[in-house]
Amino acid sequence: MWISDFLNRNRPKDLEFMAESIPRGRAMVLLGRILNRLVSQWAIPGAGRVAVCSPLVGLIAGLGAVAFLRLLALLVHYVLNGLLHFYLPPTGEGVPHAITSPYPWWLVLLVPTLGGLLSGLIVFTWAPEAEGHGTDALIRAFHRGGGQIRGRVPLIKGIASVITIGTGGSAGQEGPIAQIGAGFGSFLARLLRLTPNERRLLMLAGAAGGVGAIFRAPLGGALFACEVLYMTAAMESAALLPCLASSIVAYSTFALFITPSPIFIVPNMAFRGLAELPMFALLALACAGVGWLYVRIFYGLRDYVFKPIPLPRHIKPALGGLLLGLIALIFPQVMTGGYGWVQWGAIGMPPSLLQPHELPFAPQMGVGMLLSLALLKTVTTGLTISSGGSGGVFGPSVFIGGMLGGAVGQLLHGLFPSWNLNPSAFALVGMGGFFAGVSKTPLTSIMMVSEMAGNYSLLVPLMLVCGLNMGLSRRWTLYEEQVPSPVDSPAHQGDFVIDVLEQLRVSQVMVRTEGLELVPAGTPFVEIVRRVAQSTETLFLVVDRQGALSGVFTLRDIRLALEGTEWAPLVVADDLAHRPVLTVTLADDLHTALKRLTELNVDEIPVVAPDDPGQLVGLLHRRELVAAYTTQIDALRSPDPASVL
């Protein structure tokens, strides 16, 4: 494929995704004009409209996070607490209360089933793209959707997720709140008629604000939005500042309504040096193994269980809820997000949340229960979300990683009691390490878990486990829409074509110097026709008496001259030549060469010396240009920097 064809096809492609325009009412048009004028006046030179809009997006994302949590707390209070008499352990931000199991048994089956049914009816009736965990929809909108999210999707996603989680579904909050924030960012960008690239950035800024607020992790939220797009250690660096601005405002807005206390309270822990690293490396191995199982179960249930079932899509989440209820009859801990169970079972309760006969920060679950819950959570999360239910995967991943880390910590503590290992430290590191592997977001995981716990003393083991798990699990991911790197993103392909070609010089490409058709300027037309008939060339180079390049002509010029047969005997090569000659020098970049090839509409272009436009060096064929581009792209994907031209 010729790159110019690719460019022409790729540049307007984002416009094809603008299937949904903003409302055309007079009020919306007027609002758009007002905001456009304000944004234009306040835009900082060099920063642009995205910088001005990001705080506004963060404000709405923060309010969305507050509304989401309030609605979820209300549903949990009336359904799980009131109807099922099910009280989970409090998280670090909660208040002490007794822990109870749900009853009666038939309601444990009925409530998640009805929740799945209601969620499925809402989603598949009004916004089918809101099914699942939501983050993939955000990633897809960035890479392939031009930053477009339908206006109804955030609302439908939020309502359906509140119902799913509030009725016991095993799902988290990051997917819904990311879509709520991203949806407003996309809407505002459409309202202001921003470019596709600006729309993508505002969409990410909205996601960052929502995630940063709801998890009390503003830096982690900003990193998440930039990092979750790619499978490798890459991130959308252009979005970092907008995401930071949005996350700061969203977190501050959230703090006006809900005290931003740490979600987990951990004891004073310290990393004691090199001797502990092998122990945490074992945790990374465990995280990689369970992470592989988690991804296989998650998509295996979708592809081989729920898809083949001959039921309407609206009904399948109810089936997932019923199956979850069957497991919850024996293990109610797998219902909802379950952060409180991680605090109580794997870390231990702080003094402020202790129940009678409990010791401070003493994990209340043994190795067997912790491992059982970690494995069962992989199944129940798949039953909830892979059936078409609505909710995120970060919460369940934190649950699985925390339980797995707590189990590994207790096991190692029992094997090596003299080392005085802290199982709570392994639980905290397991949360971040596990999510880093399944989501391919190591920096996010390190910062998010540290901020959620308000503790940065375990940064070194967190870095180790996240890094090792990333390396061990590079072949699978929980987010199907991720691409390996920006080079592979449709959102950046046009940029990379231009950027890569601008990095390469004509001197780095094979220029043909033999077999050229040099035609003296005074050559008669009859001789020209004879030479053309015997040649396989398509571009003919006209030279003067000194051998300097003075023009070029093509087969089309010959055909045009033949139409005026009465003048043909008087025509010489100099009459056919195009002037001024479009050439490139050895010092020109390949992007310049591509543009001139396109202007001439030919396969080859003359290459001349940099200091003498008449001194012909050879011909550059577009085939060699494409080959150089392909080689450079492959080199950029290669881990060996020496392979880059």
Regions inferred by a protein language model and the residue ranges of each:
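Tandem CBS (Bateman) regulatory domains
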Residues: 482-515, 529-533, 549, 554-605, ...
